[in-house]
């Protein structure tokens, strides 16, 4: 699959997730089979660009793979400036967020709140596309609610404005993440536009991945929450798509190595104070299917230093293996 002049190594993409798809997580997913990883969203408000959080989101020097940076906001001029700033800091693709359902984003008329204002969407898309010389993509939902599904017209508008790929989550904003994603809307959008369409929502297994690709005709898949605590899901899906067989479960020794490497990378990236705190949620995701881990997770969440976290994980896996 290509986005503009960029050839992805496969059609599996890591979805942008605030507080999750930082550089350590993106690098890990790329190592375990993802074809591209989209960064956490960056606000178009220039007053926030110099904050520690935004600075961490802009670290791209030496990063593996294609560097896709997501921006969020509702002001066309500020969105254009955010796109330019991102490109100056290493972005090779700009992704526009019109899919985030979070209240704190929507109350600023950003994310999926924009689906109620097609005229504003058009202004934003044109402004961003005209502001940069890299491909611009769009991530969105099927509509504001079930009575106001407008993804088909938004997709056609996006293509007309020069958007070079469209990721569509199979839920409305009102659905948040409740219920099941639907794929009929994605199928209809794929039939209506000529730009690449990326299916998103509840793609949590190799079998589901193949079904969604075949049912919708989508060019690629975008995977978010199912990769939390299971970044190797991308290689599992790719293996199944290529060979029609499922990979054996990773041995516990490899899961241990992945976790320890990820936690160490978080410590190094965020530092001694913030690193251990961010590591807690990732460890919880890794261990969510370990029946014996509930007590350990509570203990781990109280640990405040990097060395103690690593020692605790070593001890946990020693007990699991014994």
UniProtKB/Swiss-Prot annotation:
It catalyses: a 5,6-dihydrouridine in tRNA + NAD(+) = a uridine in tRNA + NADH + H(+); a 5,6-dihydrouridine in tRNA + NADP(+) = a uridine in tRNA + NADPH + H(+). Its cofactor is FMN. It holds the Pfam family Dus. SUPFAM superfamilies: FMN-linked oxidoreductases (SSF51395). Keywords: Flavoprotein, FMN, NADP, Oxidoreductase, RNA-binding, tRNA processing, tRNA-binding. Catalyzes the synthesis of 5,6-dihydrouridine (D), a modified base found in the D-loop of most tRNAs, via the reduction of the C5-C6 double bond in target uridines. Belongs to the Dus family. DusB subfamily. This is tRNA-dihydrouridine synthase B. It comes from Vibrio cholerae serotype O1 (strain ATCC 39315 / El Tor Inaba N16961).
